[in-house]
């Protein structure tokens, strides 16, 4: 077993803060409409980006103790990205501010547990304020505003996303693909999405994005569990002989079958991805039939007297494209007969009319939308591959932020919603060191305004003073136009979910760091420098 090195108390917390600072200082320069870019050194060619989570993920520090701090603040960015798809830079900045101020107070003798409790209470209060000020997103104009701001003030992207949502609905499926030209455009194609991802991450052919994408694949649909390779050998032989890819939708794929598929995928012998069938019980059977009709295949079921081992070509479905990640599967342009699809939609519509339970009606409507609706595809074009990657990142951010805005509404942007929330914390009067936690949050939630101003070349303290002098809750600094104005009227807005999630994730990680008393990591005699840590 390798030797371990342990660091305690003040030294441990200082090492964590050093790691946090190195990540946060790199990320926060991208905040706001005048935020700067960061160039990442990749194995093929450099990537230019101002996407917070992309930058954070690239940072690994040499010092193992500092790297722990870096990893913790990277988790803030990742969690916020997973929850909302945007707001990662603000979340990272908030975490840094809370950790820095918290450690100052703990060094001066404050009780870490009480400080953490104060941070939690203050965060809850701010979240309540944000929810109270949230405005529901109605109309195309508001969607354009949210999408444009999240896309780093690119109006073309804002309009494209608004058009896409208008055509497939707020809850419709919108994907982003490379264009074959330099133009960025919107297409709407028939498609279906369900909430099941690949059964093993080894099936993700694109390991950077953790997705599996197939063009013109065969689709095998069954309600059986596949646990032996023998069950699917006939299908695999056909697929391999034609050089095609295969999506397997089954109750489950495990045991020897999963192991053998993964081995063949790694060797490059097969292009296969397996996902669990969506739904449960009778609903699962109905959804599998929907997929079969959409793709022109058959549900291979023993209830119909069909067996996988006795497979025939007509049982396989087809689609123009399938995309599978850890959580969902999207089937685009199923090759099913249009008359069969229309008939299936009519059957579901009839079931909706006779359904009594609201839950049943809702589920049927979802199925009908998936079968009869479409997938909006934003095709991204650019002059260079570097520009293309950067543009796709911005569109992904804008798309996620817009969906978050539809979900929970919007608040004033430019850091103002958090800035104005600071005043509500004046009413909190907690005992002892809990009040220190409140003051830490109060200071931290003013930092986004300071940083946006600094990135725009203004003095943060002057901007803060000017905003405090005005009582209007929407008044703030518009970094894009370099004027002070009513930001809500000017269309500078943020999704409430993005702001809320970023604050909560930052407070959670800050509380963990502030209550840390020891760090333990491996020690390599040949590689690692001796530090203040104890080596065992």
Curated annotation (Swiss-Prot):
Class of this enzyme: isomerase
One GO BP annotation of this record: protein refolding
Gene Ontology terms: cellular component: cytoplasm
Subcellular location(s) per record: Cytoplasm
Catalytic activity line of the entry: ATP + H2O + a folded polypeptide = ADP + phosphate + an unfolded polypeptide
Protein family per UniProt: Belongs to the chaperonin (HSP60) family.
PANTHER family: 60 KDA HEAT SHOCK PROTEIN, MITOCHONDRIAL (PTHR45633)
Subunit structure: Forms a cylinder of 14 subunits composed of two heptameric rings stacked back-to-back. Interacts with the co-chaperonin GroES.
Record's protein name: Chaperonin GroEL
UniProt gene name: groEL
């Amino acid at each position: 077993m390798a030797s371990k090195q342990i660091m305690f108390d003040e030294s441990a917390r200082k090492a964590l803060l050093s790691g946090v600072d190195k990540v946060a200082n790199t990320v926060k320069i991208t905040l706001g409409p005048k935020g700067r870019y960061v160039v990442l050194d990749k194995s093929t060619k450099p990537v230019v980006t101002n996407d917070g989570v992309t930058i954070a993920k690239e940072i690994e520090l040499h010092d193992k103790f500092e790297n722990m701090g870096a990893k913790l603040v990277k988790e803030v960015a990742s969690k916020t990205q997973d929850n909302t798809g945007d707001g990662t830079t603000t979340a990272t900045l908030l975490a840094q501010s809370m950790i820095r101020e918290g450690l100052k107070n703990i060094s001066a003798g404050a009780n870490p547990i009480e400080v953490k409790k104060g941070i939690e209470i203050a965060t809850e209060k701010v979240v309540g304020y944000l929810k109270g000020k949230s405005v529901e997103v109605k109309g195309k104009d508001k969607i354009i505003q949210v999408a444009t701001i999240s896309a780093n003030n690119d109006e073309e992207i804002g309009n494209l996303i608004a058009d896409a949502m208008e055509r497939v609905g707020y809850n419709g499926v919108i994907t982003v693909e490379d264009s074959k030209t330099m133009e960025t455009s919107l297409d709407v194609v028939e498609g279906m999405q369900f909430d099941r991802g690949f059964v093993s991450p080894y099936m993700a052919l694109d390991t950077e994005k953790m997705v599996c994408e197939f063009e013109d694949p065969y689709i095998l649909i069954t309600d059986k569990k596949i646990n032996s390779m023998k069950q699917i050998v006939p299908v695999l032989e056909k697929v391999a002989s034609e050089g095609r890819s295969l999506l397997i939708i089954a109750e489950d794929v495990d045991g020897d079958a999963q192991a053998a598929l993964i081995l063949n995928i790694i060797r490059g012998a097969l292009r296969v991805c397996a996902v669990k069938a969506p739904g449960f019980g009778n609903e699962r059977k109905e959804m599998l039939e929907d997929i079969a009709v959409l793709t022109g295949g058959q549900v291979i079921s023993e209830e119909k007297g069909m067996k996988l081992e006795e497979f025939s070509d007509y049982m396989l479905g087809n689609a123009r494209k399938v995309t599978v990640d850890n959580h969902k599967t999207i089937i685009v342009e199923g090759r099913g007969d249009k008359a069969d699809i229309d008939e299936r939609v009519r059957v579901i519509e009839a079931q909706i009319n006779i359904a009594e339970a609201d839950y049943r009606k809702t589920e049927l409507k979802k199925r009908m939308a998936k079968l009869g609706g479409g997938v909006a595809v934003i095709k991204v074009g650019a002059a260079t591959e570097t520009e293309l990657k950067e543009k796709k990142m911005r569109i992904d951010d804008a798309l996620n932020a817009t969906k978050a805005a539809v979900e929970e509404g919007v608040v004033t942007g430019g850091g103002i919603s958090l800035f104005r929330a600071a005043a509500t914390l004046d009413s909190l009067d907690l005992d002892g060191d809990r009040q220190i936690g409140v003051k830490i949050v109060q200071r931290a939630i003013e930092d986004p305004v300071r940083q946006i101003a600094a990135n725009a070349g203004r003095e943060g303290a002057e901007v803060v003073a000017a905003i405090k002098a005005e009582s209007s809750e929407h008044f703030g600094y518009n970094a894009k136009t370099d004027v002070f104005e009513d930001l809500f009227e000017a269309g500078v807005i943020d999704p409430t979910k993005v702001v809320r999630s970023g604050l909560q994730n930052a407070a959670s990680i800050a509380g963990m760091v502030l209550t840390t008393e020891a760090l333990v990591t491996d020690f390599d005699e040949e590689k690692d420098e001796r530090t203040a840590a104890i080596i065992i």
